[in-house]
Amino acid sequence: YIYGLVADIADGMGLKFLGFDISGMEGMAVRGDLPENPLDPASDKKGLQIRTTGSPMPKALMTALGYTPVTVEWNEVYSATQSGMINGFLGANAGSAYNQFRDIINYYLPIGFAVDSNRIVVSGKFWDTMTAEQQDAFATYAKEIFDESIAQTKVEEQDYMDKLEAAGVEVIDMEQADYDALAQIARDNCWPLLIDTYGQDVYDEMMAFYSK
């Protein structure tokens, strides 16, 4: 469904969308003590302030989980975390958590809030000048990039989580039930915010598709 939605948006911009190049899944990092049951909305989060972007989506998720969301620019996250201005942050995949923050964080939760990815696009006008054979070649290559990026990301994410553990950062194990519970929290609290941007019809279609 998301592929089709992005393709429609790209088409409206005069672009031909061919696929995604995945680079990681965004998690949550915490400095200091981690609350008991950190992903249970009912547990006491002790007023922990977690950095998010200015987007209402991550703010809604953190609020639903019981944290206090704080907007901090990405280039200020390190100093804000180190100084105690914030207690943690949302938005780093495992590689980023290791490479940029391993010396100041104590916990990493691979919650998979969002996918870090690049979009593979070409000019719509250029696409229309191609033969069917050339278009097929581009589409095939884009699919290969997508498939390879998924496989590579799985390996790299695990490798970086192992490195985080070796560096003294505790990576919180998550079961499928944890991801299912988070997904439901997101559907209830974050997805309705999409209506203002994409409209009621898109929201209804998403809910129907992902509720199957």
Regions found by a protein language model. Give the residues of each.
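A gly/proline- and charged-residue-enriched helix-loop-helix capping module
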Residues: Y1-G12
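N-terminal secretory/targeting leader peptides
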Residues: M13-K212
